UniProtKB/Swiss-Prot annotation:
The gene is rpsB. This is Small ribosomal subunit protein uS2. The keyword Cell cycle does not apply. Gene3D superfamilies: Glucose-6-phosphate isomerase like protein, domain 1 (3.40.50.10490), Helix hairpin bin (1.10.287.610). Keywords: Ribonucleoprotein, Ribosomal protein. InterPro entries: Ribosomal_uS2, Ribosomal_uS2_bac/mit/plastid, Ribosomal_uS2_CS, Ribosomal_uS2_flav_dom_sf.
Length: 260
């Protein structure tokens, strides 16, 4: 396995170079802006390419060390894409609404996750002894909890890296990550503040094709990390399994010799 490849052409075709209207910009983004066309800022893809590669390496390295990546994208056009990419790469996601304290108050969130698990078990067992109304209420409670927490149900604890689409919309999530020292990989459009991001990726954060490309690449980087981790484990396991094989076989000829 290796880090996923991408080309400047792919970035262009996905519209990653299109920023927002010039009057909506954040001046801190000036170093990442190539110019303007028809009052739309054009993002400098010659900077996006190395920064995207750096972000992908960080994702792969984090997962290779056994770390967890949390995908965050709650805007309408990102929601399904984020969930699919996280599930495909055995990572975690928040794609409905960021609940305040999702990271900084993990203990409370854990209690809600336990409740979700309990509801899953109860309803899987057909909720015997419950009336239709009681079952309906449990179904609704489960649906609500699953929508909010289903993507982090199996995360176990706070993540080791966060990947964010739209830093303005997910400002609370980023703030919580910063408080806990969790590094953040994020797409920074022309109206974003790059200072808060550890691994910024300059690019459009609204177009569905752009979001699809980012998520696909991040997912592939995570899968690369999983392959590297398993490869490393395979070497260790192989060595430990092979070591006792020869001594175990040695006695065989000596026990047969007297019989011959």
């Amino acid at each position: 396995m290796a880090l996923p490849d991408f080309s400047m052409r792919q970035l262009l075709e996905a519209g990653i170079h299109f920023g927002h209207q010039t009057h909506r910009w954040n001046p801190k983004m000036a170093p990442y802006i190539y110019g303007a066309r028809n009052n739309i800022h054009i993002i400098d893809l010659s900077q996006t390419v190395p920064l995207l590669h750096q972000a992908l390496k960080q994702v792969s390295d984090t997962v290779a060390k056994g770390g967890r990546v949390l995908f965050v994208g709650t805007k309408r056009q990102a929601s399904d894409i984020v969930a699919d990419a996280a599930q495909r790469s055995a990572q975690y996601y928040v794609n409905s609404r960021w609940l305040g304290g999702m990271l900084t108050n993990w203990k409370t969130i854990s209690n809600s996750i336990q409740r979700l698990r309990k509801l899953d078990e109860m309803l899987a067992g057909e909720a015997q002894g419950l009336t239709k109304k009681e079952r309906l209420n449990l179904d609704r409670e489960r649906e609500k909890l699953d929508k909010a927490l289903g993507g982090i149900k199996d995360m176990g604890s706070t993540p080791d890296l966060m990947f964010v689409i739209d830093t303005n919309k997910e400002a609370i999530a980023i703030l919580e990550a910063k408080r806990l020292g969790i590094p953040v990989v994020a797409i920074i459009d022309s109206n974003c503040d790059p200072d808060k991001i550890d691994f910024p990726i300059p690019g459009n954060d609204d177009a569905a094709r752009a979001i699809q490309l980012y998520c696909d690449l991040i997912a592939k980087a995570a899968i690369d990390g999983i392959a590297r981790q398993q490869g490393a484990l395979g070497v260790d396991i192989g060595a430990s399994v092979e070591a006792p094989v020869e001594p175990a076989l040695d006695p065989a000829p000596s026990t047969e010799a007297p019989q011959a």
